């Protein structure tokens, strides 16, 4: 049974900058996970249902207009979860609308935590490294337009790989 995820990819040059930082702070998973904003967390789907998932995602993409994301500064989920992330200061509600659209039908999943759009920069590391990540990227800032999202499939050898892109409907 395949494991899939759905996410907004962070564009270059910021994707590589944030992934390289994540690697430098000691997060061994960084090279297996493209820099992203999660919409659907890792989800195991039944064999033979990928086509239905793709059809659903295409319909969801038609229901949401492109939007702008502005990333600035850092945040954390500690003490609940050992995660440090770059925060969204613009595009939060649009990410919520998009996540709601994709997490229906075959991708209706119960979330472990409430949805909070973010870009992870350090995960499951000792507190000193999480503190370092929080401080080092406190001044990080970028802005980009979101016109699509991606379906990712997990491969045990190569990690998460985008397999299909879904364009958001053009703004009226």
List each model region and its residues.
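Short strand-connecting beta-turns/loops that link adjacent beta-strands
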Residues: 79-80, 156
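Charge-rich, low-complexity N-terminal segments
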Residues: 81-89
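Short beta-strand segments and strand-loop junctions that repeat across beta-rich extracellular domains
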Residues: 147-157
């Amino acid at each position: 049974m395949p494991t899939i995820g759905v996410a907004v990819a962070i564009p270059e040059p910021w994707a590589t900058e944030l992934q390289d930082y994540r690697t430098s702070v000691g997060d061994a998973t960084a090279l297996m996970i493209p820099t992203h904003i999660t919409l659907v967390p890792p989800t195991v789907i039944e064999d033979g249902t990928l086509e239905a998932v793709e059809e659903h995602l295409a319909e969801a993409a038609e229901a949401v207009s492109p939007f702008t994301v502005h990333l600035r500064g850092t945040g954390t989920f500690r003490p609940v979860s050992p995660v440090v992330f770059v925060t969204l200061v613009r595009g939060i509600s649009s990410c919520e609308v998009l996540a709601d659209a994709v997490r229906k039908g075959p991708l209706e999943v119960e979330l472990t935590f409430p949805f909070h759009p973010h870009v992870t920069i350090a995960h499951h590391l000792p507190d000193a490294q999480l503190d370092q990540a929080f401080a080092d990227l406190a001044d990080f800032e970028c802005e980009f337009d979101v016109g699509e999202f991606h379906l990712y499939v997990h491969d045990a050898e190569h990690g998460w790989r985008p397999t299909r892109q879904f364009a958001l409907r053009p703004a009226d």
